[in-house]
Curated annotation (Swiss-Prot):
Belongs to the SEDS family. GO terms for cellular component: cell division site; cyanelle membrane; plasma membrane. Its EC number is 2.4.99.28. This is Putative peptidoglycan glycosyltransferase FtsW. Coiled coil: none annotated. GO terms for biological process: cell division; regulation of cell shape. Keywords: Cell shape, Cyanelle, Glycosyltransferase, Membrane, Peptidoglycan synthesis, Plastid, Transferase, Transmembrane, Transmembrane helix.
Amino acid sequence: MQLLYTILKEIADAILFFFIQVFKIFRYFFYPEFKNCSKLATLLRWLTHFWLFFGLMVLISASGFTSYEEHRDVLYYFKRQFVFCLIGIVISNILMHFPLTLLLKYSNIPFFFIFGLTILTLMPNIGISINGARRWIAVYGFLVQPSELIKPFWVLQISKIFGQWEFLTTRTKIFWLIIFLIQIVAVLIQPNLSTASLLGITLWLMGLCANFPWKYLLGTVFVGLSMAITSISLKPYQLSRITSFLDPWKDPRGKGYQLVQSLITIGSGGIFGTGYGISLQKTGYLPIHYTDFIFAVYIEEFGFIGAVSLLLLIIFYFLLVITVILKTNHPVLRLVGCGAIILLMIQTLLNMAVATGIFPTTGLPLPFFSYGGNALLANLINCSFLIRLALETKDRN
């Protein structure tokens, strides 16, 4: 009981501190452009902030027990996430000051910089290997994951190329297709099948949105599936994820343990949940409960009602962005909106599908909920493009 009291007190203090600091940041970055912007832009902006803040509150609860057990600090993981939150808010608000056409003009710079970092992760003396995967580079005590950070700039660069595809020379087209392929293969080699698949699917769907001929799209599907099958056949742990997904109860204490515990966690929530901060499964039963499987802990604490409410919020967010895209006349900017929302929704829905046993374990985080500073930064930058698009839609229409 004393431990529970300590955890709850620390959580309450953290929430108070969090909102005070966020309020100060918003006051600093609240600029006049939002005072006269469309209702769509305002609503999209505040929905993004709500998603972010609510996700951080869920993370405080989901990570509290493990933080105390491993570091004797209930807020250890939250504090680290909060640092990235502040950095992300600053960067995203700065980016929202600039027209998307300007960001597209100079998108090559961050894209190739992070592209280079992705290649460096494969170098033995530079890339850091964790659990057999070489995906990180250490920078001042923080682990930088280029495959996460490149996601928003992946959208910008694809939009820039695909949006003016018919005006490009054959040589330029081949060059960029090779660059995109190298990026996907580099992530696949790390190995990181889930992120490589996400980048590939985003590329394919943006090609679909750009009205690429079906003969090219179907050809890339064959190439993508071949790469995925090859990766799975060469990496036994990826194959075991699929076999354990098909029948997790066959080996509930072995390969199926993660999914079985996730389903138990979700079932424990019932209709209304156990209450915020009172999850039992996060106390050592459900592995990676504050990262890839945080959605299961969320359902345990908020129940079926909470799960449906979150899903409705995400659907509303999606429809709001679609409305903005339909109001956008500029073809390249429309592609930016399509790519950004595709990236956000695929990660969200796949993470939920994995936690509920609908899809094999992927390793994709739940945007704004899962612990991971690199993913948080990428998602905030990605959403800043959507908000900026909503701002510009009013001006252009």
